[in-house]
From Swiss-Prot:
Assembly and interaction partners: The RNAP catalytic core consists of 2 alpha, 1 beta, 1 beta' and 1 omega subunit. When a sigma factor is associated with the core the holoenzyme is formed, which can initiate transcription.
Example GO molecular function: magnesium ion binding
GO aspect biological process, one term: DNA-templated transcription
NCBIfam families registered for this protein in UniProt: rpoC_TIGR
Group of enzyme by EC: transferase
UniProt name for this protein: DNA-directed RNA polymerase subunit beta'
Binding site for Zn(2+) 1: C60, C62, C75, C78
Binding site for Mg(2+): D450, D452, D454
Keyword vocabulary terms for this entry: DNA-directed RNA polymerase, Magnesium, Metal-binding, Nucleotidyltransferase, Transcription, Transferase, Zinc
Cofactor field: Mg(2+); Zn(2+)
Catalysed reactions listed for this entry: RNA(n) + a ribonucleoside 5'-triphosphate = RNA(n+1) + diphosphate
Family: Belongs to the RNA polymerase beta' chain family.
Gene: rpoC
Length: 1177
């Protein structure tokens, strides 16, 4: 059975005139649209009902046939078929042109495809097409050359000289069409291949480009003549609608205006040709027709754009596809959906982790069809119509039915911007009064939501399958870990942290200290009866079952800790239960801060899984809120105590600065050095004041409690409140050497206040710019990785990459342990001391094994990696390793490319924007933060380039008055010299031994240089560690595997150098697996293999170089991508996610993969016979 949307690939090509006539339902002959009196379409016009179908369902133009019973009849009076009005969205028309015109995409694009094919410059081509010059089509016996251009005067002279019929020349698209028809593609291709062998330089480049176009036409079966249009298709009228406004005026789509100009000029040209008008008039009309068609296809590509009222350029067919408002991004990749609503969110602390509060009226509207069905089922309403009436009148019975319907029917909540997959989660709805959605406080972090007026959208999964997926994969209680680094995302914040902190504090000398109680309950009762303080150190006998025997012991603790531990599993490994002394101790016997809560949740998840953890989280939430209310922590001005030491420290700093000034005035130190020392001194003084402040604050000081617990605020903010504000940056980003000495408690004077406004404004400006930049980076990352899916279990490769800790100078940025957890080994890991195998090859490393490896003193390990995965598309489960979001091995069908892009893009907004200026010292002004990440992913030449050694060898530095030079002496006597520019800082010293690819001066390295020196692996390692450095310095953890996925996509292409006996053309980019395949084929027959080099593409280039033209066209440069794809007759294999979303199929990830296609749901609660069940892979 043929299903329309069950196809495997989609192909694009040039349309022949016959094809266009076949699509069409009739010719549009008149420029009229709608009759303004009758409001009915004009016959043969742009909205003609005979061509495009009826305006109203089952009704012809003249009104002879009305009603559905005449379905399919063509009216004998007006010729309109009686059918649904929806056909006006799919029926096309056409315009027969009186003279052929060229298609602007193929003539004007860069490079001009028409120009390359005919071997003419685009400028010459333009002269011919727009009737400025004649072109010689056939010189016959005359000495004229084929394709020679003649202006009017030369043409007349040639005719006088050689006679009327002695040669053929023409102008306009007709002449070009004749010439295109004469091209022999196969012979041309052979000839070009011969020329290629002899040519070099610029000429070779041109031949390669021409060869590419010629081969495209030859292989795709497109006829070059089809680049010239004889028939123009007219798109269906409902895609270019005309609507009546209130005042009786009409609003129309720009396309109608553009079509109207084409029809008018075409009809005028026909008339002129019939009259036999003079050549010059006809020629002018033909040129105008050509311009009208250009404007219709791509307005503004050549010359001035055609404008509508108010000088606004009209939107042409190309503009309909381009950009954010174009067809691809606006209607195909994201659509508005039914069964959705949005409202303001408020906090719902009483909810369970998997619940959300849904306003009653919203729920009724969202679940309307379900409620109606249930009303009929339960016999409350007799038919659907009366059920609908009941719902619309909101009768009391409806609410009970609604309650039943929404039990076990999860809804999806989404908050924009959705930066990572945790921005959409599923919840079990609970009906609430009011009109606000209630959100669980622990879900806020994932959504980055707060309750200052944020809004969220609700979506209802309709089908049983969708509900099942929402419940099992998207329920908020299951999404406890972050997919980017595997750390918990549901960590309690603010009040909850403060309450837990308050609960687990100790206070010496509190009421009831030293008392002893026979069990927990007695101690809690004593607290509730106000005999003891919640923070008092007491002794309590606790009972525990050990090996089936009930034993007891006395422990020293506080009531607060007893209460807190009731909701915590007592086996998380914070206490060594083997030790006799610690057998009965409480699991959480320390002061709880936000950090330690994170560790508790992490441990609980690893040991007990998501369900138990989410129950524990709800308990911590309840305790936290309750005890933060009881603790009643407030802030007053009296809590900010300025440390008395501050003034001594400031005095001492002033004296030091005076000394530095004196040294500078006497010429002992330079201006830069003076500046650096002053800054250093003030930084140190500020730190000292802050330390003195923190030491002087009482442990029960509310401000100290908030900061120490991690509930709100930080040391640097307290420093500003009661210490000193310290150094500020000027608008240029340079640090001012005058610090702000006052704190907010003391108050700033006018100058200090003014200086601090610079920073405030810069902060705001940066945030606004950063959001847009970060969003665009995410979009490019998604586009480059979207087709990376886990496709198989094991690709069987023997390769891997060596990993060791990443360092920035002497500081370790990422530890080896972190890089090993959740990965597979690529070779046996052997203990260097005992020689025993710690981990065998292809083994999975969990945290315990990773600790073993590190403690054995091993510094580098070879692991399986996405870099070396052998999958032709996507990656395999073993090369990828652990799924960070579940801490288990990854499943087949997981869309790891999208997850990688989101994990890198989501923290983008936390990165800094600005370059830090440490006072204009050269070499240290390197880009950081977001611009640096972008620079790396786009593989650009960085600012502040470092000089890199090309060979291994020893360093010799020579300084003369004029310059410094560094010589590297290789072992084989090879010597390279590098001139060091003034102001650069050296990273090497005399006599050092350096490797190829090591930096000689400070700065960033051009990744392409590393590619040339160290090869693909070196470049990949460099990119990975450099991006990691930027994120880690900002305190953002991202797992390596996400970066590996992206960097692999950047290095997938091979540039062909020599084609050998393959069909590959030199100079083109091709996927590395296709390259290997082509070479394998040639090798079988003993031919010469193609030679190529792996290239490094930036993410934008890599996204555009994908095999899928749909994905590339919907990303950027739509017209260019489609032009190229059409000429090549490209086939889109629909492998990635984007292509499938565009054509409206299920994405090939998760349950949308091919192997699940045949599964049918058993929804009828039938028992499946044991022997019938098939085990589904």
């Amino acid at each position: 059975m043929f299903e329309l949307n069950n196809f495997d690939a989609i192909q694009i090509g040039l349309a022949s005139p016959e094809q266009i006539r076949e699509w069409s339902r009739g010719e549009v002959k008149k420029p009229e649209t709608i009759n303004y009196r009758t409001l009915k379409p004009e016959k043969d016009g742009l909205f003609c009902e005979r061509i495009f179908g009826p305006m109203k369902d089952w009704e012809c133009h003249c009104g002879k046939y009305k009603r559905v019973r005449y379905k399919g009849i063509v009216c004998d009076r007006c010729g309109v078929e009686v059918t649904k009005a929806k056909v006006r969205r799919e029926r096309m028309g056409h315009i027969e042109l009186a003279a052929p015109v060229s298609h602007i995409w193929y003539f004007k694009g860069i490079p001009s495809r028409m120009g390359l094919l005919m071997d003419m410059s685009p400028r010459a081509l333009e002269k011919v097409l727009y009737f400025a010059s004649y072109i010689v089509i056939d010189p016959k016996e005359t000495p004229l050359l084929k394709k020679q251009l003649l202006n009017e005067k030369e043409y007349r002279e040639a005719i006088d000289k050689y006679g009327e019929d002695s040669f053929v020349a023409g102008m306009g698209a007709e002449a070009i069409q004749d010439l295109l028809g004469q091209i022999d593609l196969i012979a041309g291709s052979k000839e070009l291949k011969e020329d290629l062998k002899q040519s070099t330089g610029q000429k070779r480049v041109r031949i390669i480009r021409r060869l590419e176009v010629v081969e495209s036409f030859a292989k795709s079966g497109n006829n070059p003549k089809w680049m010239i249009i004889n028939v123009i298709p007219v798109i269906p009228p409902d895609l270019r609608p005309m609507v009546q406004l209130d005042g009786g005026r009409f609003a129309t789509s720009d396309l109608n205006d553009l079509y109207r100009r084409v029809i008018n000029r075409n009809n005028r040209l026909k008339k002129l040709l019939d009259l036999g008008a003079p050549d010059i008039i006809v020629r002018n009309e033909k040129r105008m027709l050509q311009e009208a068609v250009d404007a219709l296809i791509d307005n503004g590509r050549r010359g001035r754009p055609v404008t509508g009222p108010g000088n606004r350029p009209l939107k042409s067919l190309s503009d309909m596809l381009k950009g954010k408002q174009g067809r691809f991004r606006q209607n195909l990749l994201g659509k508005r959906v039914d069964y959705s609503g949005r409202s303001v969110i408020v906090v719902g602390p009483e909810l369970k982790m998997y619940q959300c509060g849904l306003p009653k009226e919203m729920a009724l509207e969202l679940f309307k069809p379900f409620v109606m069905k249930k009303l009929v089922q339960d016999g409350i309403a007799h038919n659907i119509k009366s059920a609908k009436r009941m719902v619309e009148r909101v009768l009391p019975q409806v609410w009970d039915v609604l309650e039943e319907v929404i039990t076990d029917h999860p809804v999806l909540l989404n908050r924009a911007p959705t930066l990572h997959r945790l921005g959409i989660q599923a919840f079990q709805p609970v009906l609430v009064e009011g009109r606000a959605i209630k959100l669980h406080p622990l879900a806020c972090t994932a959504y980055n939501a707060d309750f200052d007026g944020d809004q969220m959208a609700v979506h209802v999964p309709l089908s049983v399958e969708a509900q099942a997926e929402a419940r099992f994969l998207m329920l908020a209680a299951g999404n406890i870990l972050k997919p980017s680094d595997g750390k918990p995302v549901c960590v309690p914040t603010q009040d909850m942290v403060l309450g837990s902190y308050y609960l687990t504090m100790d206070r010496t000398g509190a009421k009831g200290e030293g008392m002893t109680f026979s069990n927990k309950d007695e101690a809690v009762m004593a607290y509730e009866s106000k005999y003891i303080d919640i923070h008092a150190q007491i002794n309590v006998r606790v009972y525990k079952e050990i090996d089936g025997v009930l034993k007891s012991g006395i422990i020293k603790t506080t009531v607060g800790k007893l209460i807190f531990n009731e909701s915590i599993p007592q086996d998380l490994g914070f206490v060594n239960r083997e030790d006799e002394k610690e057998k009965f101790n409480l699991e959480i016997d320390f002061l709880v801060t936000k950090k330690s809560l994170g560790k508790v949740i992490d441990q609980s998840y690893m040991l007990h899984g998501p369900t138990k953890t989410s129950i524990m989280l709800d308990n911590i939430k309840a305790l936290g809120y309750h005890y933060s209310s009881i603790g009643a922590v407030t802030v007053a001005a009296s809590d900010m105590i300025v440390p008395p030491v501050k003034y001594d420290l400031l005095h001492e700093a002033d004296e030091t600065i005076d000394k530095i000034e004196k040294m500078y005035k006497r010429g002992f130190i330079s201006e830069d050095e003076r500046y650096e020392r002053v800054i250093e001194k003030w930084t140190k003084t500020t730190e000292e004041v802050a330390d003195a402040l923190m030491d002087s604050l009482d442990k029960f000081n509310p401000i100290y409690m908030m900061a120490d617990s991690g509930a709100r605020g930080s040391k640097s903010q307290i420093k500003q409140l009661a210490g000193m504000r310290g150094l500020m940056a000027s608008p240029s980003g340079k640090i001012l050497e005058l610090p702000i000495r006052a704190s907010f408690r003391e108050g700033l004077d006018v100058l200090e206040y003014f200086i601090s406004t610079h920073g405030a404004r810069k902060g705001n400006a940066d945030t606004a710019l950063k959001t847009a930049d970060s969003g665009y980076l995410t979009r490019r990352l998604v586009d480059v990785c979207q087709d990376v899916i886990v496709r198989e279990e094991d690709c069987g490769t023997d390769n891997g990459i060596y990993v060791s800790e990443i360092k920035e100078g002497s500081e370790v940025i990422e530890e080896l342990r972190e890089r090993l957890i959740g990965r597979y080994t690529a070779e046996d890991v052997v203990d260097p001391n005992s020689g025993e195998i710690i981990v065998a090859r292809n083994e999975y490393m969990n945290p315990i094994i990773a600790d073993k490896v590190v403690s054995a003193g091993i510094k580098k390990v070879k692991i399986r990696s996405a870099f070396t995965c052998n999958c032709k598309i996507g990656v395999c489960a073993k090369c990828y390793g652990m799924n960070m979001a579940t801490a288990k091995k990854i499943d087949i069908g997981e869309a790891v490319g999208i997850i990688a892009a989101q994990s890198i893009g989501e923290p983008g907004t936390q990165l800094t924007m600005r370059t830090f200026h440490t006072g204009g010292v050269a070499g240290s002004d390197i880009t950081q933060g977001l611009p640096r990440v972008e620079e790396l992913f786009e593989a650009r030449k960085p600012k502040g380039l470092a000089i890199v050694s090309e060979i291994h060898g020893n360093v010799r530095i020579e300084e003369t008055k004029k310059k410094r030079a560094v010589f590297v002496m290789g072992a084989d006597g090879d010597e390279r010299s590098y001139d060091i520019p003034f102001g650069s800082r050296l990273k090497v010293s005399d006599g050092d031994y350096i490797e190829a690819g090591d930096e000689i001066t400070e700065g960033s390295v051009n990744p392409h240089d590393i590619m040339n020196i160290k090869g693909v692996d070196g470049a990949r390692r460099y990119l990975l560690s450099e991006v990691q450095k930027v994120y880690r310095l900002q305190g953002v953890d991202i797992n390596d595997k996400h970066l590996e996925v992206v960097v692999k996509q950047m290095t997938r292409k091979v540039k062909i150098l020599e084609s050998g006996d393959t069909e590959l053309l030199p100079g083109i980019m091709i996927d590395i697996f296709d390259f290997q395949e082509a070479n394998d084929k040639v090798r079988e027959f003993g031919g010469e293999e193609a030679k190529g080099e792996q290239s490094l593409l930036g993410i934008t280039k890599a996204a555009l170089a994908t095999d899928s033209f749909l994905s590339a066209a919907s990303f950027q440069e739509t017209t260019r991508v489609l032009t190229e794809a059409a000429i090549k007759g490209k086939v889109d294999p629909l492998i990635g996610l984007k292509e499938n979303v565009i054509i409206g199929k299920l994405i090939p990830a998760g349950t949308g993969m091919m192997k699940y296609k045949g599964l049918n749901l058993n929804t009828k609660n039938e028992k499946i016979e044991e022997n019938e069940t098939e085990i589904v892979e």
